[in-house]
Amino acid sequence: VIRIPLHKFTSIRRTMSEAAGXVXXLIAKGPISKYATGEPAVRQGPIPELLKNYMDAQYYGEIGIGTPPQCFTVVFDTGSANLWVPSIHCKLLDIACWTHRKYNSDKSSTYVKNGTTFDIHYGSGSLSGYLSQDTVSVPCNPSSSSPGGVTVQRQTFGEAIKQPGVVFIAAKFDGILGMAYPRISVNNVLPVFDNLMQQKLVDKNVFSFFLNRDPKAQPGGELMLGGTDSKYYRGSLMFHNVTRQAYWQIHMDQLDVGSSLTVCKGGCEAIVDTGTSLIVGPVEEVRELQKAIGAVPLIQGEYMIPCEKVSSLPEVTVKLGGKDYALSPEDYALKVSQAETTVCLSGFMGMDIPPPGGPLWILGDVFIGRYYTVFDRDQNRVGLAEAARL
């Protein structure tokens, strides 16, 4: 088993808002949405390339690319399937490129040229560059705290030459390492974990995430490749079958707010996504949900809850496979401090993901933080158990 310590940073959305001042400006303009509403031009297949909102991604770990390894911080993202990092050849006008580590193929003895161009479409522009092949080490430099790393040979990844807009400039991470199914991989590139399985580098084809919800705690969490660790959860794991092998998609029976409201009535589909920090659902249903927890709209789909009311709010229960996964108001109300004031943001956000991929609910870090999550590629299922409070 390989353990990768995860570090928690303030999300870009919060960092930007701190730069912008006032709570009203909390929400960055025009979020870069991974679940883009349009159908991208590139993909002729049946799957729209739903793209993602990294404004809130908060958990990162380190990987190495090349020989000797060049280190990068990446978001280990179960809601996408490609690996990309900034390239040394990025455009001068690409400011995001100035603020991050860049891959230099000249410095790697294991680099193999590919050169195919790639585009990943986002709500606010597209990320583009070309593909290259090299060795990927996870973690970058195995240390005493995370011994035993793994080296994946011949991994194809994207060297980003152009990154859109202001979003990536403020990002604390250099790139993204996608851990979803190959089916949603841009250019049909084999994802890192698939390559790892083919090269038989782990005993079991599973990986699991522990995300520490205590913002001050270090490490911020742990990604484990090839197994699970019972010190991170209580009780036993319950497994839920993947219903469509693209995202880590499972069936959700319903979602209840106390005893006053049920949404996703009659069942719906949900994806478990480590690269999204909130719980996201269809706009109309989330609007009702926010009303039921007394949240008031901010802007761009986010809502605020008066902090003094948090302790008296109802539990929210996600029902999966007949089992109740409860979230207390402390789990779903996020405290954000700014200068002298602390505001509480609702951990739910509305966004409509169009067919054929959608409609979908997204169970992001708010959910995964409370429930230790195991992603099982051998049996195509997601395991959940209550996370231990370390």
UniProtKB/Swiss-Prot annotation:
GO biological process, one term: proteolysis
InterPro entries, sorted: Aspartic_peptidase_A1, Aspartic_peptidase_AS, Aspartic_peptidase_N, Cathepsin_D, PEPTIDASE_A1, Peptidase_aspartic_dom_sf
Glycosylation-annotated residues: 114, 241
E.C. designation(s): 3.4.23.5
Propeptide: 1-44
Pfam families recorded: A1_Propeptide, Asp
Residue pairs linked by disulfide bridges in the UniProt entry: 71-140, 90-97, 264-268, 307-344
Compartments (UniProt record): Lysosome; Melanosome; Secreted, Extracellular space
Primary site of residence: other
Peptidase A1 domain ranges (all copies): 59-385
Description of how the protein assembles with itself and partners: Consists of a light chain and a heavy chain. Interacts with ADAM30; this leads to activation of CTSD. Interacts with GRN; stabilizes CTSD; increases its proteolytic activity.
UniProt protein name: Cathepsin D
Species this chain originates from: Bos taurus
